[in-house]
Amino acid sequence: MRNKSLIHTKHIKTQEGTPLHLEYYLLNDSLLDGCAECYGVEILAQTGEAQCYAGIPRITMRGTRIFTLIDQLAYFAVTPDSLQDVLQDWL
């Protein structure tokens, strides 16, 4: 079963000056009938009526590592479009 928890929100402006609202989520999957946990991330971006998101489940089984990743994603205002590239560099 997958749970999703909001960890960070961030308000920035795009290069064109348009307000952009970002939300960073922790994805938590129970494995082996609840005996193990696996963590991932999801980013939601909203500008006006438009929304886009990207999520990558099951990145790590270490809780401290995923929180470090989510903190860094929010700090650097990573968007859904760049999540895959950033994660490849992080791994």
Show where each model-derived region lies.
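Intrinsically disordered, low-complexity N-terminal regions enriched in serine/proline/glycine
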Residues: 23-24, 38, 52, 74
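A general marker of short, structured functional hotspots
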Residues: 7, 20-21, 35, 63, ...
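Mixed-charge, Lys/Arg-enriched low-complexity segments
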Residues: 48-91
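Amphipathic, alpha-helical segments enriched in basic
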Residues: 1, 16, 41-48, 58, ...
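A short, structured beta-strand/loop element
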Residues: 31-55
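Residues in flexible loops and secondary-structure boundaries
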Residues: 9, 14-15, 30-34, 64-67, ...
